[in-house]
UniProtKB/Swiss-Prot annotation:
<dbReference type="InterPro" id="IPR001790">
    <property type="entry name" value="Ribosomal_uL10"/>
</dbReference>
<dbReference type="InterPro" id="IPR047865">
    <property type="entry name" value="Ribosomal_uL10_bac_type"/>
</dbReference>
<protein>
    <recommendedName>
        <fullName>Large ribosomal subunit protein uL10</fullName>
    </recommendedName>
</protein>
<dbReference type="GO" id="GO:0070180">
    <property type="term" value="F:large ribosomal subunit rRNA binding"/>
</dbReference>
<keyword id="KW-0694">RNA-binding</keyword>
<comment type="similarity">
    <text>Belongs to the universal ribosomal protein uL10 family.</text>
</comment>
<dbReference type="GO" id="GO:0022625">
    <property type="term" value="C:cytosolic large ribosomal subunit"/>
</dbReference>
<keyword id="KW-0687">Ribonucleoprotein</keyword>
<dbReference type="InterPro" id="IPR043141">
    <property type="entry name" value="Ribosomal_uL10-like_sf"/>
</dbReference>
<dbReference type="InterPro" id="IPR022973">
    <property type="entry name" value="Ribosomal_uL10_bac"/>
</dbReference>
<comment type="subunit">
    <text>Part of the ribosomal stalk of the 50S ribosomal subunit. The N-terminus interacts with L11 and the large rRNA to form the base of the stalk. The C-terminus forms an elongated spine to which L12 dimers bind in a sequential fashion forming a multimeric L10(L12)X complex.</text>
</comment>
<dbReference type="GO" id="GO:0003735">
    <property type="term" value="F:structural constituent of ribosome"/>
</dbReference>
<dbReference type="InterPro" id="IPR002363">
    <property type="entry name" value="Ribosomal_uL10_CS_bac"/>
</dbReference>
<dbReference type="GO" id="GO:0006412">
    <property type="term" value="P:translation"/>
</dbReference>
<keyword id="KW-0699">rRNA-binding</keyword>
<keyword id="KW-0689">Ribosomal protein</keyword>
<dbReference type="Pfam" id="PF00466">
    <property type="entry name" value="Ribosomal_L10"/>
</dbReference>
Amino acid sequence: MGRTRENKATVISDVQELFQDAQMTVIIDYQGLTVAEITDLRNRLRPLGGTCKIAKNTLVRRALAGQEAWSPMEEFLTGTTAILVLKEDLGGAIKAYKKFQKDTKKTELRGGVLEGKSLTQADVEAIGDLPSKEQLMGQIAGGINALATKIALGIKEVPASVARGLQAHVDKE
């Protein structure tokens, strides 16, 4: 038995609601995955602000109607489609998916959409290779700390060099 009209409307509204808060979507082919593997993928994405949504392509197209920012996604909606909706840590979520893909070897990354622009598989993987927010903050803090250390050593070196010069003059006499 197929879905009822009310059930389809619920799925469409759920998908629209997911897209409202999303920064990026990644479209994958999930053919061959078991329910346990899909649950594993969802569990890997959840702590990073990601969601894995599986819905019929027709219902996703209806949910996309009137949403210009997500319209480029339609080109990827063929076959068995799962949509990874990423809200927070884009790089971390993509890394989690790539690790899942490496572990299962069953999914295929089709592409993605970011800020209304269609992304190829290479584009999505490049975003995944970017450092995370925490790593960037650590690099910035390390750079600031190194700069402060160099300034402190420079300030300390001026009186020390004067003292060495005076000591050399005293030793000479």
